[in-house]
């Protein structure tokens, strides 16, 4: 890892800005080879998000993870160690959805990152499958979310965490979030369980049966479930069109 990048990650984690997987456990190293750690520089300062490799040259993440400079780490387990499996690639282009709405009305919260160089496939780095544009994930589906960061309000971790979450009915989130949109968002996490994804886990994938169906978008300020995820299936035409258009522009 470049010394400056490692120092920035160390400072970020000292400030506890990395977010939360609540009620989960440590993932087996490299069991989620599509996971990406994003270090983002913006006028507001340094922040982190999750993301996931969808092709050797593209990472998908949340639209609100935008910044003037983004560094991507692939193949990581402990984000504060210089692991031999890690690949560090800068972002050539960050393409946020043209209809993205910032908080408080978060809509179309999705962004493609074109990498400056292609990722090398290995046991620790592999793309995840994307859904068919016509196939909708159903309530009751048991899915996995992974991310780095806090595991409770005050306790942090540097290693990748994972949690299994169940897709809820749209009404469950419509009752809690004023701007929930069932066409472009998924309601995830049983309100009766203390399991959720939160804050800096933003941009990470909801993976159901080995297919990325959602992107961590937002939730309640307390971190209690359910949380709202961007529905990838609704954006497949835009994703395919954008990757096709940019592939010839290296």
UniProtKB/Swiss-Prot annotation:
Subcellular location: Cell membrane; Cytoplasmic granule; Secreted; Cytoplasm, Cytosol
Record bears the keyword Glycoprotein: yes
Propeptide residues according to the Swiss-Prot or TrEMBL record: 19-20
Pfam families named in the record: Trypsin (PF00089)
Peptidase S1 domain: residues covered: 21-244
GO molecular function list: caspase binding; heparin binding; peptidase activity; receptor ligand activity; serine-type endopeptidase activity; serine-type peptidase activity
Reactions catalysed, as given in the entry: Specificity similar to chymotrypsin C
Disulfide partners: 49-65, 143-208, 173-187
GO cellular component: cytoplasmic stress granule; cytosol; extracellular space; lysosome; membrane; nucleus; plasma membrane; secretory granule
GO BP terms in the entry: biofilm matrix disassembly; defense response to fungus; defense response to Gram-negative bacterium; defense response to Gram-positive bacterium; monocyte chemotaxis; negative regulation of T cell activation; neutrophil activation; neutrophil-mediated killing of gram-positive bacterium
Alphabetical keyword list: Antibiotic, Antimicrobial, Cell membrane, Chemotaxis, Cytoplasm, Disulfide bond, Glycoprotein, Hydrolase, Lysosome, Membrane, Nucleus, Protease, Secreted, Serine protease, Signal, Zymogen
Gene3D superfamilies: Trypsin-like serine proteases (2.40.10.10)
Glycosylation sites: 71
PROSITE patterns: TRYPSIN_DOM, TRYPSIN_HIS, TRYPSIN_SER
Location of the active site: 64 (charge relay system), 109 (charge relay system), 202 (charge relay system)
UniProt region (Important for antimicrobial activity), positions on chain: 21-25, 97-112
Enzyme Commission number, as recorded: 3.4.21.20
Keyword Protease: yes
Membrane topology: Peripheral membrane protein
Family: Belongs to the peptidase S1 family.
Protein function: Serine protease with trypsin- and chymotrypsin-like specificity. Also displays antibacterial activity against Gram-negative and Gram-positive bacteria independent of its protease activity. Prefers Phe and Tyr residues in the P1 position of substrates but also cleaves efficiently after Trp and Leu. Shows a preference for negatively charged amino acids in the P2' position and for aliphatic amino acids both upstream and downstream of the cleavage site. Required for recruitment and activation of platelets which is mediated by the F2RL3/PAR4 platelet receptor.
Protein name (Swiss-Prot/TrEMBL): Cathepsin G
Originating organism: Rattus norvegicus
């Amino acid at each position: 890892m470049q010394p400056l990048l490692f120092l920035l990650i160390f400072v970020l984690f000292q400030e506890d800005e990395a977010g939360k997987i609540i009620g989960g456990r440590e993932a087996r190293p490299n069991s989620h080879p599509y996971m990406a750690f994003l270090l983002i520089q913006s006028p507001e300062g340094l922040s982190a998000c999750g993301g996931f490799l969808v092709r050797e040259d593209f990472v998908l993440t949340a639209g609100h993870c935008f910044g003037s400079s983004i560094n991507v780490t692939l193949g990581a387990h402990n984000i504060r160690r210089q692991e031999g499996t890690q690949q560090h690639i800068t972002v050539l282009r960050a393409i946020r959805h043209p209809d993205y709405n910032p908080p408080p009305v978060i809509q179309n919260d999705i962004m493609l990152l074109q990498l400056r160089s292609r990722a090398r496939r290995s046991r620790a780095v592999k793309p995840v499958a994307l859904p068919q544009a016509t196939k909708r994930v159903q309530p009751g589906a048991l899915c996995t979310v992974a991310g780095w960061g806090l595991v409770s309000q005050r306790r942090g971790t540097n290693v990748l965490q994972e949690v299994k979450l169940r897709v809820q009915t749209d009404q469950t989130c419509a009752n809690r979030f004023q701007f929930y949109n069932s066409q472009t968002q998924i309601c995830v996490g049983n309100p009766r369980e203390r399991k959720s994804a939160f804050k800096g886990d933003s941009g990470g994938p909801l993976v159901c049966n080995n297919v990325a169906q959602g992107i961590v978008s937002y939730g309640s300020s307390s971190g209690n479930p359910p949380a709202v995820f961007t529905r990838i299936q609704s954006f497949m035409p835009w994703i395919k069109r954008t990757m096709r258009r940019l592939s010839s522009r290296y």
